[in-house]
Every structure is written in structure tokens, then in C-alpha cells.
């Protein structure tokens, strides 16, 4: 990642240390009894934990909340998925207990699939990002593509992402692999050295 992040031309400033961004590890996407629960979440979370341990506090956790304006197409969306049309403080939208200790920073709460935007950029600046979370085929890919458009350097840890099912996960990973060099698809073993502090 050092070579990919690189030094800016003519600059002696070293690149910023990468951050881990964990997308939406919430009950609604993780619980086996949720209509949107990912069967891949337990295995992916084990890798998320490894990445967070390596990042030494440079971790942001995001949360999707059902607060979008119902006068827009989000109203149609929640009409199609009435089980999810609940108040933002419903336990369905809580971060899963095992993810609450991943980050020392406040959770970034947004009503959009994609989490890339000024709220996130204010915290991490231009640092490279390792992306993980759930679901690969919705909020992860939406975040990754917006990050690519913004000029971010993003590594997707594929085995630290959980799709709605394995086929949809694989399809989303394939799409994200079409966006080098902004997006790089890797696995946890390859992403760990990017996050560990330099000696």
C-alpha cells in the first residue's frame, strides 16, 4: 500500500496511515432471524476483528438508519420492506454487541446505502482506506464506488465483507474488481500489513 499510496510528486510528506472503515455491522444485517441477515457475517466478522486489531484505533464503524425522507423513492423502498420501517432507535438498527469495541470513535450514522461523503472524509482526510462490512452487494459496493469517484485509494478486504448471499457477494466483488487503481480487491491476509503501524 505504501507504493500505491505513494508520496505526492515533489512532496516530502509521508502518506497518511490507512484507516479501516467497517460498514454497518448491525443486527438487521447480521441476525440470522432478520430478513436481511447475512449468512456470511460470522466468518466475515472474524476477519473484521483481525483488521481492527491491526489498525490500532484507526477504525470507523458506520450505521445505516431508516431516516430518509419518505416523500422520495425511499418511501417506496420502505413500503417494499415494511419490516425495516421502524424508528431509528429500534434494536434492529443497533450495532451488534461484538462490534461495539471495534472503534474508539463515534459511530457514523447515515440514511444512505453509501457511506462515503464529507462526514467520513472529515475524519480520515486523504488517507487510504481498507473497506469491510455488510452487505457486500449493497452498502459496501455503494460506499466503494463513491469513494472511487472521490479519488480515494480503497482496498476491499473481500473475506471481511458479508453479502446477502454468496452469489451476490461474489457478483459485487467482481464489479468492484473492475475499478483499479482506485479500488483494489484483496483479502484479510493482504490487508493486515497495510493497517499495521510502521515500525
Give residue spans per PLM region.
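Active-site-adjacent betaalpha module
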Residues: 2-19, 47, 53-57, 83-199
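A short alpha/beta connector and helix-capping loop motif
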Residues: 16, 33-65
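Active-site flanking residues adjacent to catalytic metal/cofactor-binding acidic residues
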Residues: 23, 62, 158
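Short acidic, Gly/Ser-rich segments with clustered Asp/Glu that frequently serve as metal-coordination loops
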Residues: 26-32
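Short, glycine/acidic-enriched loop or turn micro-motifs at the edges of active sites
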Residues: 27, 66, 162
Amino acid at each position: 500500500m505504501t507504493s500505491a499510496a505513494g508520496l505526492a510528486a515533489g512532496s516530502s510528506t509521508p502518506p497518511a496511515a490507512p484507516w479501516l472503515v467497517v460498514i454497518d455491522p448491525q443486527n438487521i444485517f447480521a441476525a440470522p432471524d432478520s430478513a436481511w441477515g447475512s449468512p456470511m457475517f460470522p466468518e466475515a466478522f472474524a476477519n473484521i476483528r483481525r483488521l481492527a486489531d491491526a489498525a490500532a484505533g484507526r477504525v470507523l464503524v458506520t450505521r445505516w438508519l431508516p431516516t430518509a425522507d419518505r416523500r422520495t423513492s425511499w418511501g417506496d423502498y420502505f413500503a417494499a420492506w415494511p419490516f425495516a420501517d421502524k424508528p431509528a432507535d429500534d434494536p434492529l438498527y443497533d450495532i451488534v454487541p461484538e462490534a461495539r469495541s471495534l472503534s474508539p470513535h463515534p459511530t457514523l450514522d447515515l440514511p444512505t446505502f453509501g457511506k462515503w461523503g464529507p462526514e467520513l472524509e472529515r475524519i480520515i482526510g486523504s488517507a487510504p482506506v481498507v473497506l469491510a462490512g455488510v452487505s457486500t452487494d449493497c452498502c459496501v459496493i455503494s460506499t466503494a464506488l463513491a469513494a472511487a469517484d472521490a479519488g480515494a485509494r480503497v482496498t476491499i478486504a473481500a473475506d471481511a465483507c458479508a453479502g446477502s448471499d454468496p452469489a451476490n457477494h461474489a457478483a459485487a466483488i467482481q464489479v468492484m474488481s473492475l475499478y483499479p487503481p482506485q479500488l483494489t480487491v484483496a483479502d484479510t491476509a493482504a490487508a493486515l500489513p497495510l493497517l499495521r503501524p510502521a515500525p
